[in-house]
C-alpha cells in the first residue's frame, strides 16, 4: 500500500472523498489507512477487503470512464488530469491484480482450470476455432502461470493487463 501513496492521494482528490457521503457516514475518508487484508479460503478465488479493494473499485470505474468518455474532463469528474495522473489511477488496478492473481503459487492454482480447458481445446482433433471470454484477472493469472515474460504497453495508462485486452493462442499443424 505504501507504494500507492500518490495514487491514493490522487483518487481521494478526484473523488473529493473527504466531502463524500461515504466519509460523512464514517465509512471511508481516505485510502491510506493501510487496512488491506487478503482473504484466502479453500475452494474460492483470492479476495481482499480494505483500502486497496476500495481504491481498486474507484480506479476500475475511472479507467472505464477514461476509455468510454470522449470528454476527458467529464471522465475525471471535472478534473484536468494528465496522462501521468491517469497512469497513477491505473496503477491501483495493476497492483490489485498483481496482489490477488499473479503471485506464482496463486496464479498456477487460479489459472489451472482455465489452462486445462485451453489445453483440451488445443488438442481437440477437429477444433478449428475456440473463443473464450474472461476478465483482465484471468489474463493476469494465465500469463503469470505460463511465466510470460515482462512486457511494456506504450501509450497505455494501464501497464499490466488493460481492460479489454486479449490473449491469443494459435495452433499450427
Stretches found by the model and what they are:
Residues 1-130, 134-173:
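Signature for phosphate-centric chemistry
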Amino acid at each position: 500500500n505504501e507504494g500507492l501513496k500518490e495514487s491514493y492521494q490522487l483518487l481521494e482528490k478526484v473523488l473529493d472523498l473527504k466531502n463524500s457521503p461515504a466519509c460523512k457516514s464514517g465509512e471511508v475518508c481516505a485510502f491510506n489507512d493501510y487496512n488491506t487484508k487478503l482473504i484466502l479460503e479453500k475452494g474460492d478465488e483470492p479476495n481482499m477487503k480494505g483500502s486497496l479493494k476500495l481504491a481498486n473499485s474507484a480506479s476500475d470505474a475511472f479507467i472505464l470512464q477514461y476509455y468510454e468518455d470522449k470528454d476527458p474532463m467529464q471522465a475525471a469528474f471535472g478534473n484536468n488530469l494528465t496522462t501521468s495522473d491517469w497512469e497513477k489511477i491505473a496503477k491501483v488496478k495493476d497492483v490489485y491484480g498483481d496482489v490477488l492473481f499473479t503471485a506464482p503459487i496463486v496464479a498456477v492454482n487460479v489459472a489451472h482450470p482455465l489452462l486445462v480447458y485451453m489445453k483440451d481445446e488445443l488438442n481437440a482433433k477437429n477444433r478449428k476455432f475456440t473463443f473464450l471470454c474472461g476478465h483482465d484477472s484471468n489474463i493476469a493469472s494465465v500469463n503469470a502461470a505460463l511465466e510470460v515474460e515482462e512486457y511494456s504497453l506504450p501509450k497505455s495508462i494501464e501497464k499490466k493487463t488493460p481492460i479489454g485486452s486479449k490473449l491469443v493462442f494459435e495452433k499450427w499443424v
